[in-house]
Amino acid sequence: MATSDHLARMRVEYGSAEKDGSVDLDADWLDIGWVALLNQWMTEAHDAGVAEPNAMVVATIDGEGRPVTRTVLCKSVDESGISFYTNYDSDKGAQLAARPYASATFPWYLLGRQVHVRGRVTKVSAEETADYWSKRPRGSQLGAWASQQSRPIASRAALMQQLADVTARFADVDEVPVPPHWGGYLIAAEVVEFWQGRENRVHNRIRVRDGAVERLQP
């Protein structure tokens, strides 16, 4: 396959712009712990104007052993891992039920940074799900009830009718309950890698695994 010229012209030289940072990522940055550094980088991405800096690309494996990716929002970060919420009956839910492992990548292109987290996936507790659910806007709660995620539908009009039906169903309810098919997943932080783009593709990669911090070749 030949390389397209217009794609080649999109090449970016890392490490030369102020936004990339003048200090090289090193293992001692992890002295504060990977959780603190991930939160710090997320905050810096937000301050730099990155939209939804908590967005992460989550990869799962389908029934044929093929990878599937999608972007979701990270909703918590602690020593146990990172969490997100979704429809358990969705394709990703079925994939995680069959193969409970996933990887997640936070791509902050504007800053020339990425963080990768991978490990075993478990459902968060019903209490954690209920707590997060209570903080969601009512419209988002109704949308979770209305959508049979990943299932085909005839038209957008049909989808909006499902939303209208759900809205009417809960019209007299002050607090919309958590759907039985909806909740959170926790990706255990078995491996966490911090990546910083540098000049000439000699990037910085620092990995945390089993408590050990080590530099990887780019």
UniProtKB/Swiss-Prot annotation:
Its job: Catalyzes the oxidation of either pyridoxine 5'-phosphate (PNP) or pyridoxamine 5'-phosphate (PMP) into pyridoxal 5'-phosphate (PLP).
Reactions mediated catalytically: pyridoxamine 5'-phosphate + O2 + H2O = pyridoxal 5'-phosphate + H2O2 + NH4(+); pyridoxine 5'-phosphate + O2 = pyridoxal 5'-phosphate + H2O2
Official protein name in the record: Pyridoxine/pyridoxamine 5'-phosphate oxidase
Membership in a protein family: Belongs to the pyridoxamine 5'-phosphate oxidase family.
Assigned EC number: 1.4.3.5
InterPro entries: Pyridox_Oxase, Pyridox_Oxase_CS, Pyridox_Oxase_N, Pyridoxamine_oxidase_dimer_C, Split_barrel_FMN-bd
PANTHER family (alphabetical): PYRIDOXINE-5'-PHOSPHATE OXIDASE, PYRIDOXINE-5-PHOSPHATE OXIDASE
PROSITE patterns per record: PYRIDOX_OXIDASE
Keywords: Flavoprotein, FMN, Oxidoreductase, Pyridoxine biosynthesis
Binding site for substrate: R11, V12, E13, Y14, K75, Y132, R136, S140, R201, V202, H203
Biological pathway: Cofactor metabolism; pyridoxal 5'-phosphate salvage; pyridoxal 5'-phosphate from pyridoxamine 5'-phosphate: step 1/1; Cofactor metabolism; pyridoxal 5'-phosphate salvage; pyridoxal 5'-phosphate from pyridoxine 5'-phosphate: step 1/1
SUPFAM superfamilies, sorted: FMN-binding split barrel
Species: Mycolicibacterium gilvum (strain PYR-GCK) (Mycobacterium gilvum (strain PYR-GCK))
Cofactor binding note of this UniProt entry: Binds 1 FMN per subunit.
Superkingdom: Bacteria
Pfam families to which the protein is assigned, alphabetical: PNP_phzG_C (PF10590), PNPOx_N (PF01243)
